Design a protein with these regions (language model features):
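N-terminal entrance/gating region of PLP-dependent enzymes' catalytic architecture
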Residues: 1-2, 6, 357-361
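Conserved PLP-enzyme active-site core in the AAT-like
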Residues: 3-13, 18-237, 255, 302, ...
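Residues in well-ordered beta-strands of folded domains
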Residues: 69, 252, 278, 301, ...
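Active-site lining segments that contact anionic ligands and/or coordinate catalytic metals
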Residues: 167-169, 246-250, 267, 272-274, ...
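Short acidic (Asp/Glu) and glycine-rich catalytic loops that position anionic groups and cofactors
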Residues: 179-184, 199-209, 243-251, 294-302, ...
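Conserved small-domain helix->loop->beta segment predominantly found in fold-type I
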Residues: 206, 217, 221-267, 277-294, ...
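PLP-dependent enzyme catalytic core of the Aspartate aminotransferase-like
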Residues: 222, 289-366
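A common structural junction motif
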Residues: 273-277, 326
Length: 366
C-alpha cells in the first residue's frame, strides 16, 4: 500500500482488487448506490465494457444496475467535448435525471481526458469524479501523462499489467474520505481472498517502476510516436494525426481503406504473422454499419516491445512487417518467419531488477 501511495502520491490505496474490473466495481460501490446514474465513455469512443450499460452486457449496468449516460465526444479531437458534455449534464439534472458519478478513462486512450474542466460542475451538483487509469497507470505514476488525483478525481482505479508491468491484479486509489467505503467494498463486498501471490508481484512491479519507471515510460512514448509516424509514412490512416497521433502508449489506426478492410481480418492475419494487435471500434463505425465483429480500426501499444528493449528503429521495422501483411499482402508465413527471426534479439526484460532471465522463461524455484 505504501508503495502505491508513494508512486501515485495518493492519500489512500487498496491493493486487494484481483483485476481492474473488480477495482471498478469497488469504486462504483463506494461512490454510488445501486441504480444511480453515471457518465462514461461509450465503447465506440474508447470506453471499457466495465463502464457500459446493461443492454451491452456492461459491468456498471448489469452488476450494479447503473444507468449510464455517455459523454458527448469530439471525433476529430478523439476526446470528450467539454462544453457539450456540461450542457448534457445540466439538461439531465434539470429533467430530474440526477447524475451521481463522472467517470473518465477508457481502454483506447491516446490523449489525456479533461478531468479538471469538470471539477466545478461536480462540486455544484455533489457528483463524485472517478478515473479508470488501467491502460495508462504506469505513465501517470511516472509523471508522463496527466495527474488525475491532482486534477480533480476523487477515486482512481488501475490494473497492474499494462503500462505498469506487473501481474494481473488491480488497485484503488482515493482521497482519504472514501477509504472506509472502499475497504468495505473490497471485503466483505467483493472478495474473501485477494490473491496474495499477485499482491507480492504488484509490490515488486511498483518498486521497479519507482526506480526505472521514468526511463521506461519515456521510451514507451518515444516508441509510440515513432511507430505511428512510421505507419503514417507507409500510407496508414492514423487517428489524431493533427495532434501528433498520441500522447500515450496507444495508437489507433483506421484500416478501412487497406486491402484487408476490417479490423477482425487484420487482427487474425497479423496474428498468423506473429504480430499481436487487436481490432477496435472507431467512433463512426456504427454509422457505417460496422460493429465489434467487423470494426474499422485496430489498436496498437508499445509497452511490451519497450520492456523488451526495443527503441525507435525497431518501431520502424515493426511498421514494415505490418505493412507487408496489411498493405502489400505478402505471404504470411514468410513474414511470420521474419518476425520470429527479428524477435530473437529481444528476449530479456529491461527496466527491471533482473535483466538476465529470459523474458518468457518458466521459472523454477525447486
Amino acid at each position: 500500500m505504501n508503495l502505491a501511495k508513494k508512486m501515485f502520491n495518493a492519500e489512500f490505496a487498496d491493493v486487494r482488487p484481483i483485476s481492474g474490473v473488480v477495482a471498478n466495481l469497488m469504486m462504483y460501490t463506494a461512490a454510488m448506490d445501486v441504480g444511480d446514474r453515471m457518465m462514461a465513455l461509450s465503447i465506440a469512443h474508447g470506453g471499457h465494457i466495465s463502464h457500459a450499460r446493461a443492454n451491452l452486457g456492461g459491468t456498471a449496468g448489469q452488476i450494479r444496475g447503473h444507468k449510464v449516460q455517455n459523454w458527448v465526444f469530439d471525433d476529430e479531437e478523439f476526446n470528450i467535448d467539454v462544453d457539450a458534455s456540461i450542457d448534457k449534464i445540466r439538461g439531465l439534472q434539470e429533467k430530474g435525471d440526477e447524475i451521481k458519478f463522472l467517470l473518465f478513462g477508457g481502454s483506447v486512450f491516446p490523449f489525456p481526458h479533461p478531468v479538471k474542466e469538470f471539477r466545478e460542475i461536480a462540486d455544484e451538483y455533489g457528483m463524485i469524479i472517478g478515473y479508470d487509469s488501467a491502460h495508462v497507470s504506469g505513465l501517470i505514476g511516472a509523471g508522463r501523462f496527466q495527474d488525475p488525483l491532482r486534477e480533480g478525481a476523487d477515486i482512481m482505479t488501475l490494473s497492474t499489467h499494462k503500462t505498469l508491468p506487473g501481474p494481473q491484479h488491480g488497485c484503488v486509489l482515493a482521497k482519504e474520505e472514501y477509504a472506509d467505503a472502499i475497504k468495505r467494498a473490497a471485503f466483505p463486498g467483493m472478495m474473501s481472498n485477494h490473491h496474495l501471490h499477485n499482491v507480492a508481484g504488484f509490490a515488486v512491479a511498483l518498486a521497479e517502476m519507482l526506480e526505472f519507471g521514468k526511463d521506461y515510460t519515456a521510451q514507451i512514448l518515444k516508441n509510440a510516436k515513432a511507430l505511428a509516424q512510421s505507419l503514417h509514412e507507409r500510407g496508414f490512416h492514423l487517428i489524431g494525426e493533427h495532434k501528433g497521433f498520441t500522447e500515450s502508449h496507444t495508437i489507433l489506426v483506421d484500416i478501412t481503406e487497406t486491402p484487408l478492410k476490417d479490423g477482425s481480418k487484420v487482427e487474425e492475419t497479423l496474428e498468423d504473422a506473429n504480430i499481436i494487435i487487436n481490432r477496435n471500434l472507431l467512433p463512426w463505425d456504427k454509422k457505417r454499419g460496422r460493429d465489434y465483429r467487423t470494426p474499422g480500426g485496430i489498436r496498437l501499444g508499445t509497452s511490451e516491445t519497450t520492456r523488451l528493449g526495443m527503441k525507435e528503429s525497431e518501431m520502424d521495422a515493426i511498421a514494415e512487417f505490418i505493412t507487408r501483411v496489411v498493405m502489400k499482402e505478402e505471404d504470411v508465413k514468410k513474414v511470420a518467419a521474419d518476425v520470429a527471426e527479428f524477435k530473437k534479439d529481444y528476449q530479456k526484460v529491461h527496466y527491471a531488477y533482473d535483466n538476465e532471465t529470459k523474458a518468457y522463461a518458466h521459472l523454477r524455484f525447486m
